[in-house]
Amino acid sequence: MNRYINYINNIEINISSYCNKLTSNNKFIFYFYRIVTSAADWWMYLIYAILLLLITDYNKAINMIILGSLAYFFHYPIYYIIKNITKRKRPFEREENNIKCFVKPPDKYSMPSGHTSGITITILTIIHYFEGTNIFLILPILIALSRIFLGVHYPSDTIIGFLLGCTCYYIASLILT
């Protein structure tokens, strides 16, 4: 079992290091992922809520905000419990010579990715209320990639973040339906 975990860990380090080197060597990748990752910064959710109130039916906007807020209500305690149980160091801390940090991380530990889980909740809420918006599922993928390329998460951190976002959204939607 330990051998298997080491094998997976080495794959993650290699992927993270490779992506990070691409970011170091290519200004387009650097700026692209810096912009992408900011779409999941905490303050953007306030902007999304205000935009909803301005561009869509008031009742629909309120229902979306309630659904998203309930999902976040479940999300944050689980997120912090996972962070504090795993206490996984961020890639740039574990691999100081191979991986650079290109953004300021919002907290100390790596697992799970809060940017990925948060944007997943937001996008699933949008898809729930607006038909034909499945294309927006690309955003959690781009956010996840940005966190890897910018040196603050391993691939498994973003996968767990995505699953956490899906789970919290699902629980909230079950409660409200």
What kind of region is each of these model predictions?
Residues 1-44, 79-102:
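N-terminal transmembrane-helix/juxtamembrane module of multi-pass inner/ER membrane proteins
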Residues 26-29, 59-63, 92, 130-135, ...:
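Membrane-helix interface segments
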Residues 46, 68, 72-76, 162, ...:
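Alpha-helical transmembrane spans of integral membrane proteins, capturing the lipid-embedded, hydrophobic core
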Residues 51-78:
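Interfacial segments of alpha-helical transmembrane regions
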Residues 53, 78-87, 127, 169-177:
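Membrane-water interface at transmembrane helix exits
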Residues 57, 84-92, 151-156, 177:
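Transmembrane helix-loop junctions in multipass membrane proteins, especially transporters and channels
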Residues 76-82, 144-148:
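Transmembrane alpha-helical segments that form the membrane-embedded catalytic/substrate-channel core
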Residues 96-177:
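Membrane-embedded catalytic cores of phosphoryl/pyrophosphoryl-handling enzymes
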